[in-house]
Amino acid sequence: AGVICSKVARYHERIHHPDRLTQPLRRTGSKGSGQFSPISWDDALDEVAQRFLEAEQRHGSETVWPYYYAGTMGLVMRDGINRLRHVKRYSGFHSTICVNMGWNGFIAGTGRLAGVDPREMGCSDLIIIWGTNAASTQINVMTHALKARRERGAKIVVIDTYNNATAKQADLFVCVRPGTDGALACALMHVLFRDDKADWDYLREFTDCPDAVETHLRPRDPAWAEAISGVPASQIETLASMIGSTPKTFFRLGYGFTRQRNGAASMHAALSISAVAGSWRHEGGGAFHTN
């Protein structure tokens, strides 16, 4: 027996819903009027192709931008248009808008997108779930995290902007003001450096410019971060102490806190905590975003 992820558990209702669109519609009224008339697939394809050609001729082929989101995640349906896009020299983009900030921030810190195997959470003593409501959307994360709590006594920390289902299962919930996660991350690293909890051997062997990072973070203490993030300085001190005293700290970094103007920098900052603490060197430690 298994569990169906709540993200797809109701897909059958969407597929078989009586109001689901099953044929193309052409708008016959003004935008927002809700006035549409059915047309054939042949007419619809011809009209779309004609619009593409008009855009190419008037403004250049790069003004046509095939875009996908979460409606279809299958490789054939999602990426099938790439052959047309390449031949016609249409604009392209790196995956989707919703993941670009997070992916680039993670790559900036590690050089590649892959992180620690999420199954290592079962070996962790401290699990920090940051910017993702895993209890509602990621069964695998909560399975491993709760196993570590049950079998090892691991602590679970949730950092998010609201008290969601995951936060309700946390040993410590840190409620951060939206868009300010980077400041929180900087203050956590500040405390690790200040209290001699930084793993300098790891930093000097595996990271770039650790001395410059430490200098950069000196003025960014918990009081500074509290004014920006709304997280009490005392809570920042508590969390930093937990990280600094727990070698097997696993960071599960989600997409939520990266979907804002400073998203890439916020991801890079949060990811850097595991390097400052030296968590990467331990089984059950390090960071995971997506594999």
Name the predicted role of every residue range.
Residues I243-N291:
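A glycine-rich, hydrophobic/aromatic-adjacent loop/helix-cap motif
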Residues G179, A183-T249:
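P-loop NTPase catalytic nucleotide-binding module
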Residues F52-E54, A114-P118, I236-S241, V276, ...:
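Generic recognition of flexible, low-complexity loop/linker segments
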Residues G92, L192-W200, N262, A277-G284:
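Short helix-capping/linker segments at secondary-structure and domain boundaries
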Residues H59-T63, A198-L203, F250, R281-F288:
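Flexible, glycine/charged-enriched surface loops at secondary-structure junctions
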